[in-house]
Amino acid sequence: MTEAELIKCLSERFYSDFADTVARRVRDAGAVGLLYEVVTSRCEGLPRAVGHKVAFRGAYVLEKIYFDAPDSFMPYAGLFCRTDFPACADPSARRHFAKVMADLLGRFTPEVRDLERIAEAAARW
């Protein structure tokens, strides 16, 4: 799965089992890292409406992957806590990131300075 294919998949028509289907496709393609990168990139270079769809739906798919196969997300846990959770700017994506973070803090222990960033971001949201 290429970045262009992933963006197309996230920005096209939404359907009832979207998150399950896309999460399965991403995992089967070994593209969890690519999904993580796309979702946390702030979708620079995409038209605003497309960027919002990619951020929101990508965060939804990432949440699905996290809860269905947490081990596939764990390589990104440190980065998620350190920079990507606090930097999330899309209000719709924040909802999915917050669900992941609420569970992640029971499985992963971030650095103290990262915990402060997480708390500040959550309070700001």
For each of these PLM feature ranges, what is it?
Residues M1-W125:
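Alpha-helical scaffold domains
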